[in-house]
Amino acid sequence: MGGDYAPGPILEGCLEAIGRFPINIKFVGKIEKVKDAAEKTGLTELLENEIDNNRLELIDSGEPIGMNEEATTVRKRKNSSINVAMDLVRNNKAEAVYSAGNSGAMMASAIFRIGRLKGIDRPAIGALFPTRDQTRPVLVLDVGANTCLLYTSPSPRDTA
C-alpha cells in the first residue's frame, strides 16, 4: 500500500481497472486506512460493491515500507504490505504484484520471498507507458544495467 499519497489514488486506480478489465484484485494494506481513503474520496459504495461482487478483496498488513527507507527493510518488517503481497504470489494466491511504492523494497521482497529464475542475477522492473494509440501501450523495462570498465592484461597479439 506504499506510494505517494497512498492509499487513495491507488484504490481509485484499482477500482477503475476493475471497471475496465476482467480482473480481480487483492488490495493489500492497512484495512482501516483503505476504508478511510474510500470515504474521503467518495468511493465507499463502489468499494463495498466490488467486495460484494468478489472483484476486490482487502487483505490486512502491517506498515508499508516508506519511499525513503532502505530496500532491505523488508527483511525486518515481515508483515509489510509488500511482503504480504509477495507471499500471495509465492503461495499461488495471486498472479502478480503491482506497487506504486518503494521500487527497491519491491525488488528486494520479490527476490527474498519468491526468488529468481535460474541464470537471472538482476530481474527487470517493467512499466506500461501509454502511446498515442491507446490500444498499444509500450512495455518499458528497467534492467539495472551498469557501466563498468574491464581491465585486462594485454594479449600476446597486442605486444607483437
Model regions and ranges:
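Short, acidic/small-residue loops that bind anionic groups at enzyme active sites
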Residues: 109-142
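Single conserved hydrophobic/aromatic residue that forms the stacking wall/gate
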Residues: 151-160
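Contiguous, glycine/small-aliphatic-enriched amphipathic segments in soluble metabolic enzymes
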Residues: 1-100, 105-112
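Secondary-structure boundary/capping motif
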Residues: 6, 149-150
